[in-house]
Amino acid sequence: MHAYLHCLSHSPLVGYVDPAQEVLDEVNGVIASARERIAAFSPELVVLFAPDHYNGFFYDVMPPFCLGVGATAIGDFGSAAGELPVPVELAEACAHAVMKSGIDLAVSYCMQVDHGFAQPLEFLLGGLYKVPVLPVFINGVATPLPGFQRTRMLGEAIGRFTSTLNKRVLFLGSGGLSHQPPVPELAKADAHMRDRLLGSGKDLPASERELRQQRVISAAEKFVEDQRTLHPLNPIWDNQFMTLLEQGRIQELDAVSNEELSAIAGKSTHEIKTWVAAFAAISTFGNWRSEGRYYRPIPEWIAGFGSLSARTEN
């Protein structure tokens, strides 16, 4: 069967700290074009690789990877909220297949997800509920982090499973590219934040969640004025990364350590492993070609903003 892929940066700052209208129109046009291509493909199943930002996963249990057999979006930063349409039996079968392939994939029957999962479903499919989805969490912020090699192997395992389903499968990768927004770190946290990172942050009071979101908005506003206030975006790295993906050379990323990636492009750049997993997955379907490449550094969203599609040729 055929597969389609789309990888897209996300940002909670969309609608809160936006770039100039010209840039916003350009990005919206890119997303609209991707949405049209996906609609023409008419997927029967979505596999969504996405990270979390201490909204669903915490240090009480922090797996490198987790498949949501059931999942609910919390609606942070005004993103869509509600249950994701996960086909339970298919998700269970996927988990068993991935485990048999040698990848230790955690499962959750009540996975809580944030804008990292919700935005691509909203932007590219028109909502959370349009197509059955297998949501796959890839840890991108909480050390210790999975590396490129293991993430690639996860994508390959999921790709091999879905290639047997006789369905039109859409692989989505959500996150990146270079960026380092103000995300708390356990090693530097005070007692209150440590408690939140250990699990109490899963049910934040509305007032505290609003303060947290306002801190991110304020950081973006300062970053627009002075890009020395956060780790700088790295367009050179971002474009080199996208070229590796387009050329099917993702295995070369195995040699890039987590520490090196953080230093080059920022500590939240590890979200790009969702893109690696998606490209690894589609590679198991046979020959493919990329299309729709777009990139622009957008300080207002604290992100090197990228968009890239691929389709199988068989």
From Swiss-Prot:
Gene3D superfamilies named among the record's database cross-references: LigB-like (3.40.830.10)
Active site: 115 (proton donor), 179 (proton acceptor)
Keywords for this protein: Aromatic hydrocarbons catabolism, Dioxygenase, Iron, Oxidoreductase
Gene Ontology BP, a term: 3-phenylpropionate catabolic process
InterPro entries from the UniProt entry: DHPP/DHXA_dioxygenase, Xdiol_dOase_suB
EC nos: 1.13.11.16
Cofactor(s) annotated in UniProt: Fe(2+)
Associated pathway: Aromatic compound metabolism; 3-phenylpropanoate degradation
Pfam families: LigB (PF02900)
Reaction(s) this enzyme catalyzes, per UniProt: 3-(2,3-dihydroxyphenyl)propanoate + O2 = (2Z,4E)-2-hydroxy-6-oxonona-2,4-dienedioate + H(+); (2E)-3-(2,3-dihydroxyphenyl)prop-2-enoate + O2 = (2Z,4E,7E)-2-hydroxy-6-oxonona-2,4,7-trienedioate + H(+)
Domain of life from the UniProt record: Bacteria
Sample GO molecular function, one term: ferrous iron binding
Keyword Oxidoreductase: yes
Family the UniProt entry places it in: Belongs to the LigB/MhpB extradiol dioxygenase family.
Biological role: Catalyzes the non-heme iron(II)-dependent oxidative cleavage of 2,3-dihydroxyphenylpropionic acid and 2,3-dihydroxicinnamic acid into 2-hydroxy-6-ketononadienedioate and 2-hydroxy-6-ketononatrienedioate, respectively.
Subunit structure: Homotetramer.
NCBIfam families reported for this sequence: PRK13370.1-1, PRK13370.1-4
Name listed for the protein in its UniProt record: 2,3-dihydroxyphenylpropionate/2,3-dihydroxicinnamic acid 1,2-dioxygenase
Organism per entry: Escherichia coli (strain 55989 / EAEC)
Gene name for this UniProt entry: mhpB
